[in-house]
A protein has these predicted regions:
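Secretory targeting signals
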Residues: 28-57, 127-175, 195-273, 320-328, ...
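Short hydrophobic, aromatic-rich alpha-helical segments embedded in or entering the lipid bilayer
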Residues: 303-327
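Hydrophobic membrane-insertion alpha-helices, especially the h-region
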Residues: 16-32
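Aromatic- and glycine-rich beta-strand/loop motifs that create alpha-glucan
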Residues: 1-20
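Short helix-to-coil transition segments within interhelical loops
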Residues: 183-191
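Long, solvent-exposed extracytoplasmic domains/loops
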Residues: 51-143
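Short loop-to-helix capping motifs
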Residues: 10-14, 189, 276-278
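Transmembrane helix segments
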Residues: 275-310
Length: 347
């Protein structure tokens, strides 16, 4: 009865449909924009800016008349010009790697002041791409078949994690305490029934997540054709470079969401069962069911909560995702902790 009631409430409840539509929109909208979110675009912008600044201030003198700092700048400009003029991805990566390596030496010596972490990420990006054997670097999001929506999905899906089981559990409890259905008089279900409730919540939550992802996947499939599920990805985790594929990332993301939803769902079902017997009433039940999700609902917790460190990849906020996933991050999410990780080579 609980399982049938839950399914009926989900199908009839407007909140469930609204939640699914929001998920679908969040995962689908980014695909409609042919955004140049991949590393080479931003790297070339930075190099061009450096070359322009160097040409403006460079003295008209021979190499012997340059100071050590000016000689280093001239060397950087030479690598930057070579990268900008490169006709192949391999040539670009070779010159860019030399550029960022020399820039890194400047950060270490103190002769260059700026965002050292971003420079290190760019250097890691070049090295990882070179070692992965990629022969064609996508210039924009839609150049990567089928998976162009995946960077945004990785960035935003963890933010939706607390809301799905919270919504479904609340629907279950509020429905179970309505006078017209089970009301507060209903006895606590037996263990077998409790297990059915938990799995119903998990199944419904997973279905809603997949329903949210499906429109984006279908749209990307129609736009680009079925593409490179084995597209190589390299990322830093606990200070080590690890390689995987886009398909593995997508699978791991769904498993992580399912595991998190399961944990919250079990807590919610146990609490709701206890409160219906001891403190009957829809308001009390709903508040206690929501309790496991509260720590994850704050803005700061969504970005830095320890639970999100369980994900196999770095977690980026949606704002960073729109501009930097596919390139390299502007900061290390969770830096200073033992579980800090950073996406170095994007999709």
């Amino acid at each position: 009865m609980y399982c049938r009631l839950l399914l009926k409430l989900i199908l009839r409840d407007k909140a469930a449909w609204i939640c699914t539509l929001v998920l679908a929109a969040a995962f689908s909208v980014p695909i409609a924009f042919n955004s140049p979110i991949y590393g080479p675009f931003f790297m070339k912008q930075g190099m061009q800016g450096f070359v322009d600044a160097f040409n403006t201030r460079a003295p008209q003198a021979s190499g012997t008349d340059l100071s050590p700092e000016q000689q280093a700048d001239a060397e950087l400009a030479r690598y930057a010009n070579a990268a900008l003029a490169a006709q192949t991805d391999a040539a670009f990566l070779d010159s860019a790697e030399s550029y960022y390596a020399l820039m890194g030496e400047g950060f270490q010596s103190g002769s260059i002041v700026g965002d050292r972490e971003t420079n290190d990420a760019a250097l890691a990006y070049c090295r990882a791409l070179s070692s992965s054997g990629i022969t064609d670097i996508p210039a924009s999001a839609n150049d990567l078949p089928f998976l162009s929506f995946l960077p945004y999905a990785i960035a935003t899906a963890p933010s939706f994690l607390p809301f799905i089981p919270f919504l479904l559990s609340s629907i279950l409890v509020l429905g179970a305490t309505r006078p017209a259905t089970l009301a507060a008089k209903a006895p606590a279900p037996k263990f077998r029934r409790l297990i059915q409730i938990v799995f119903s919540i998990i199944a419904a939550g997973t279905a809603m997540l997949l329903a949210g992802l499906a429109p984006g996947g279908i749209y990307a499939l129609a736009l680009n054709g079925f593409g490179q599920i084995g597209y190589p990805i390299a990322f830093f985790h606990d200070g080590a470079l690890t390689t995987t594929t886009a398909g593995n990332v997508f699978t791991a993301l769904l498993l992580a969401l399912l595991a998190g939803g399961t944990l919250i769902s079990v807590c919610s079902a146990v609490l709701s069962t206890a409160t219906r017997r001891v403190l009957a009433g829809p308001l009390t039940s709903a508040l206690l069911v929501a309790a496991p999700a509260f720590p994850l609902l704050s803005d700061s917790a969504l970005e830095h909560n320890a639970a999100l460190n369980l994900l196999p990849l770095a977690v980026f906020s949606p704002i960073e995702a729109t501009g930097y996933v596919g390139c390299f991050p502007t900061e290390f999410i969770g830096s200073g902790s033992g579980s800090a990780s950073m996406l170095a080579v994007a999709l």
